[in-house]
Swiss-Prot record:
Residues 20-34 have a biased composition (Basic and acidic residues). Residues 20-42 are annotated as: Disordered. This is Ribosome biogenesis protein NSA2 homolog. The modification Phosphothreonine is found at residue 81.
Length: 260
């Protein structure tokens, strides 16, 4: 055995440390975070080369994943497809691939879902970050500009606890926090003042959804228990989605249409 392979020799004689495999697993888990940190801190030409290398690695990984996925799908083989009459026991081998059938099924389900939740406002203007988040300057010389204040109406749940003001990035003013919405039932043609349960989706950005920002076109969840709606099984419906149809920051109230 070569002289420099003393670690391998020791392992052959006495085995691994008891915590070796655990430490190795943890180190591999940390590696992605460490590489990310390294990439963020690098500057100049070294950073360019490192980013290029990481980019190539990611492309290679995606190609490998794609190849593995391709291996599991059955593709149509035109040469083997028999011509003319085919006996019943060979029908399942004919032309159509399993992947294509699955893809068509998924597309069909998506279409059904889209029809089920057809919204009153299919298209709305996207809200930019500049008009929705105001930069708040902090520090002794007002040089720090990492804090943002939400300038639109938002919903904050009852269980929400603020972070310490020193570390709070997004400020949601109390005057812009709304708890109720005027929801119109399209079939009953009646409007109800219902409590908001949460913000399902803000079309402008996922960040606004997590912040609970309510703008025109936002889908919110409202408490419809007092409407007395029931399912086919006879259970009372608790929450239902509604789409906001006005600009709440201008009108001072939230008007929405129930999605039925």
């Amino acid at each position: 055995m070569p002289q420099n392979e003393y670690i391998e020799l020791h392992r052959k004689r006495y085995g691994y440390r008891l915590d070796y495999h655990e430490k190795k697993r943890k180190k591999e888990g940390r590696e992605a975070h460490e590489r990310s940190k390294k990439a963020k801190k690098m500057i100049g030409l070294k950073a360019k080369l490192y980013h290029k290398q990481r980019h190539a690695e990611k492309i290679q990984m995606k190609k490998t994943i794609k190849m593995h996925e391709k291996r599991n799908t059955k593709q149509k083989d035109d040469e083997k497809t028999p011509q003319g009459a085919v006996p019943a026991y060979l029908l399942d081998r004919e032309g159509q691939s399993r992947a294509k059938v699955l893809s068509n099924m998924i597309k069909q389900k998506r279409k059904e879902k889209a029809g089920k939740w057809e919204s009153p406002l299919p298209k709305v203007r996207a809200q930019g970050e500049t008009e929705l988040l105001k930069v708040i300057r902090t520090g002794k010389r007002k040089k720090k500009a990492w804090r943002r204040m939400v300038t639109k109406v938002c919903f904050v749940g009852d269980g929400f606890t603020r972070k310490p003001p020193k570390y709070e990035k997004f400020i949601r003013p109390m005057g812009l926090r709304f708890k109720k919405a005027h929801v119109t039932h399209p079939e009953l043609k009646a409007t109800f003042c219902l409590p908001i349960l949460g913000v399902k989706k803000n079309p402008s950005s996922p960040l606004y959804t997590t912040l609970g920002v309510i703008t025109k076109g936002t889908v919110i969840e409202v408490n419809v228990s007092e409407l007395g709606l029931v399912t086919q099984g006879g259970k009372v419906i608790w929450g239902k989605y509604a789409q906001v149809t006005n600009n709440p920051e201008n009108d001072g109230c939230i008007n929405a249409v129930l999605l039925v």
